[in-house]
């Protein structure tokens, strides 16, 4: 098996800053950079799977301060804490785009962003970076887990955050 790719903290920072630095396409909504920043911040601060992030609804945030209700694999529900940077990014996006209910992340036409669209936006930002390898949403998830473990988080906590049913799945990150 190949070694898993883990982004450095400086690469993560570079990636998170890209939406605000890249000029907006003419047809893009004025709030696109805020939405994309919120998506990238949320990916890194929660370790969500791509499908979990795409499926988020505004109601998954409401009434839960700094916590997100996530429906993962096998329709298992879990609560995931959201970092303050991600929370601020989500609030800025929601306010600018006037997203008050329904899907959390929407297109200009107010449709839910698909997993393919989210993957494409990540690739677009990577083309504008000097990050030397292909980053996928799952590699952001790996980086999230590895950085938590490196900072001293215990395996069981990381298992719960990632929504793994088996500890052996989480042990891959050690």
Predicted region positions:
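Conserved catalytic core of the tyrosine transesterase superfamily
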Residues: 1-174
């Amino acid at each position: 098996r190949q070694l898993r790719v883990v982004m450095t903290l400086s690469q993560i920072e570079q990636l998170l800053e890209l939406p605000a630095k890249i000029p907006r396409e003419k047809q893009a909504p004025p709030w696109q950079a805020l939405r994309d920043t919120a998506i990238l911040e949320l990916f890194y601060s929660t370790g969500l799977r791509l499908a979990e992030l795409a499926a988020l609804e505004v109601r998954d945030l409401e009434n839960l301060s700094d916590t997100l209700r996530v429906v993962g694999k096998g329709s298992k529900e879990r609560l995931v804490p959201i970092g303050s940077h991600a929370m601020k990014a989500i609030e800025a996006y929601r306010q600018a785009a006037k997203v008050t209910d329904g899907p959390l992340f929407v297109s200009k036409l107010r449709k839910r962003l698909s997993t393919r669209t989210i993957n494409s936006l990540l690739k677009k930002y990577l083309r504008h970076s000097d990050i030397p390898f292909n980053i996928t949403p799952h590699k952001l998830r790996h980086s999230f887990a590895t950085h938590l473990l490196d900072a001293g988080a215990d395996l069981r906590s990381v298992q719960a955050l990632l929504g793994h049913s088996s500890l052996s799945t989480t042990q891959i990150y050690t």
